[in-house]
Every structure is written in structure tokens, then in C-alpha cells.
Amino acid sequence: MKHAIEFTHHNHPFLHVGSRKKSTHSFFIVVEKGAVLVRLGKNEHLVSAGTGFWLPFDCLHALTALPGTNYYQVDFSIRLTTAVCSHAGFFKVTPLIAALLDELSQTASEQHQWEGPEGRILKVLADKAAQLKVSTKTLSPALAERHHSALTLILNGSKITENSDIKAIESVFNQSVKELESCMVMREAIRLQRSGRKPAQIATELSVPETLLNTLALPILGKPL
């Protein structure tokens, strides 16, 4: 990191599958549109629009951004003297935090001046980050707990049939369950590809036709598998 605090506005028109890794600094994300999946250990948390999630230094995690997702990220260097939260979890995005992030997004990140107005905003965000109260007691604060088991099934590649679960999950993701299921298939395909599998091998391991993978690749990944 060039500065002690840095801001990035991420735009993902297509599925983005991050690798599992330990964070080299503390950071938080706030989803503006779409949804980000955060894997911590065996659990995967859904960060929907308007929701924030904090990840501390040295935290093993993986991020997946669904197609059409925009989110803000603020990174805090280990050089920062301000104490920050040492636990991962959801946090409440206050109107002030939302306004500060929106203000930062009006200017390209590479044009931000540490000694200018952007630097002052980032320092205010650092103060707010020091006060965050986080929790991982829920898989998604936007989804009623009775639907969490269905959400877990989908994220693990299974299908759901209960209408109430389908309606609740679709309202949070703002896309159909079938679209979400297709994204999960392609996420696993990407992971297998990264481990050296060829398309035919991936299709066999996922028990799907190779033609289906080819059909899903362009609209979901923006490129062939």
C-alpha cells in the first residue's frame, strides 16, 4: 500500500472469483449494488447492497462478487497507528459512512490526494473503523434466519425447491435462483480450471455437459472457460 488508508471502487460486470488467502492488511467492503460472498472457514456470508463487512489483518478469506456487483473497499495498512477491529464480521453502514464513500467515489482512486480532501475523508473513515462493532452470527442480515439453510445449499451447489426460500433469496440477490445456481456452477468450474483441469474434466467432475459450461461462460464470465 502506498498510503496508510486507501479507497477502491470495484465494478464487476461479470463473476469475479477471488482466491482463498490471508489478508495482508485490514479492510472493509460496502456493497453498493449486487452481492459479495465472503468465505470464512466453513461458512460463507452474503454481503448484499447497503451492507458492510470487515476483514482484519491476517484473516483467511475468499471473496466472490456476483455479476453486476459494485462495491467500495477501504484498506487500512498495518502501519496505521489507530487501533482497528481484530475480528471479522458484518457492521452497520451508517449514513455518515455511506456519504463519505459516495464522496470518495466521485473521483478516480488514482487521483486521490493524501494531503487533500480525499485524505481527510479517509482519516475520518479510519476513526469510524476504530469504532466498528462486527458480528458473524448471521450468514446474511438481509435474509431471515429461516432461509439460511436454503442459502447454504445454493452456495454449495445444490438446488432448492421451497417457494418461500426461493422468493426470499431472489429478493436479496435481485436475480433468479436459477441464475444464482448457474453462477455457483461457474465458480466451481473456475476453481477447477485454476487447479489445472481441462474443460472436459471440469464437466465430468461437476456432472454437467461441457456444452452447458460453454453456454454459461460468456454471459457469466464474459469470456470462454
Regions found by a protein language model. Give the residues of each.
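Generic protein-terminus/edge-of-domain signal
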Residues: 1-35
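A cytosolic small-molecule/anion-sensing beta-strand core signal
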Residues: 32-33, 48-49, 67
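Short beta-strand segments in beta-sandwich/barrel cores
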Residues: 33-39, 52-53, 61
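Short acidic-glycine-tyrosine-enriched beta hairpin
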Residues: 41-57
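Ligand-binding loop in jelly-roll beta-barrel domains
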Residues: 59-90
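An amphipathic alpha-helical interaction segment
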Residues: 93-166
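Basic/polar phosphate-binding segments, predominantly the helix-turn-helix DNA-binding elements
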Residues: 152-181, 191-225
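Pre-recognition alpha-helix immediately N-terminal to the DNA-recognition helix
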Residues: 184-188
